């Protein structure tokens, strides 16, 4: 069984508006059968943090195109994207690159 994890989740570039304007969250993820990965984290975020218009953040089982994801300041594409296994004290930053004009 995977141990509980504490991670920092941040939202920027306007994405924080979907989370009641709160940019930084200290998240305690409970222990579960399988290790926590980004895919599981997104499900948890949708259930526990996302306050409105989930279609602007989630598409299928991933983030919408136009949302940049950084894990410990590195592009998630370099780390396995949805399959990246979270470690205790990881920092995950979601930045919306889509802006109205």
From Swiss-Prot:
Protein's cellular compartments: Cytoplasm
CDD domains xref list: Ubl_Urm1
Protein origin, superkingdom: Eukaryota
Main subcellular location: cytoplasm
Cellular-component GO terms for this entry: cytosol
One of the record's GO molecular function terms: sulfur carrier activity
Entry's family note: Belongs to the URM1 family.
The name this protein goes by in its record: Ubiquitin-related modifier 1
């Amino acid at each position: 069984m995977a141990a509980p994890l504490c991670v920092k989740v941040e939202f920027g570039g306007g994405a924080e508006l979907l989370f009641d304007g709160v940019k930084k969250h200290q998240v305690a993820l409970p222990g579960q059968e399988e290790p926590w990965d980004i895919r599981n984290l997104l499900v948890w975020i949708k259930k526990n943090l996302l306050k409105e218009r989930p279609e602007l953040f989630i598409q299928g089982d991933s983030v919408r195109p136009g949302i940049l994801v950084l894990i410990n300041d590195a592009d998630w594409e370099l780390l396995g994207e949805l399959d990246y296994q979270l470690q205790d004290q990881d920092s995950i930053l979601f930045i919306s690159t889509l802006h109205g004009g």
